[in-house]
Amino acid sequence: MEITEFRQRLEERGFSLSQAQLDQFEHYYHTLVEWNEKMNLTAITDKEGVYLKHFYDSLTAAFYVDFTKVATVVDVGAGAGFPSIPLKIVFPELRVTIVDSLKKRIGFLEHLSETLGLKGTAFYHDRAETFAQKKEHREQYDLVLARAVARLPVLSELCLPLAKVEGTFVAMKGAGANEELTAAQGALKKLGGSVIQNEQFTLPIEESERHVIIIRKERSTPKKYPRKPGTPNKQPLS
């Protein structure tokens, strides 16, 4: 995706980026590629691919969620900062927290945030299972984001405990999302969540299937969830 198309497609969706914001995306791209030579951040390094499959894809969450009405966001397993850093660039008032299990990635994100001049960001090197059991984070966030981290029954156990009651968990998925959603029904019931939207669309240019699944946190998650590190993945809730 060329930068001009990136800008135009966002404008069509009602998001008009300033030159300063476009410059931030350019800096993000160059920093990502530079650091990727030292550590494995992404398999996608060509400029058009990064703009489409990382930047634009991350921002599709805003096509279905009004981020101007969200104060606090936590991104679980953000890797190289997707989707939360692109969203932070477009919605600078967001207070963004990122948790990732790899310390090197957190180092990259701290450097990136500083050089982009982002305010209101926090980064934690932690497992999602232990992070969500800490009282300063548990049920403290308006919105929890995750992009293709794990299958939905597993992801729900990692993410829903972080959402406030009446908050939102947004899972960004590809093809196979409907099957994951079916498999996650039991987990969602146990964790206090309920699906309110499953938005299916096609990523432009490559025409690949995408889903933005919006789950409302209707009641407090039982304290036993998430279970100890590794257990949600080995023994998914059903």
From Swiss-Prot:
What residues does S-adenosyl-L-methionine bind to?
77, 82, 128-129, 147
* Annotated transmembrane regions: none
Note down the stretches annotated as region Disordered. Answer: 216-238
Enzyme Commission (EC) number: 2.1.1.-
Q: Supply the alphabetized keyword list.
A: Cytoplasm, Methyltransferase, rRNA processing, S-adenosyl-L-methionine, Transferase
Question: Which GO cellular component terms, listed alphabetically, does the Swiss-Prot or TrEMBL entry include?
Answer: cytosol
| Subcellular location as annotated | Cytoplasm
Keyword Methyltransferase tagged: yes
Among the GO molecular function terms of this UniProt record, one is:
rRNA (guanine-N7-)-methyltransferase activity
* HAMAP family, alphabetized: 16SrRNA_methyltr_G (MF_00074)
State the family it belongs to: Belongs to the methyltransferase superfamily. RNA methyltransferase RsmG family.
Instruction: Note the NCBIfam families from the entry.
Output: rsmG_gidB
Q: Which PANTHER family match?
A: S-ADENOSYL-L-METHIONINE-DEPENDENT METHYLTRANSFERASES SUPERFAMILY PROTEIN
Role this protein plays: Specifically methylates the N7 position of guanine in position 535 of 16S rRNA.
What protein is this chain from? Ribosomal RNA small subunit methyltransferase G
Q: Which gene encodes it?
A: rsmG
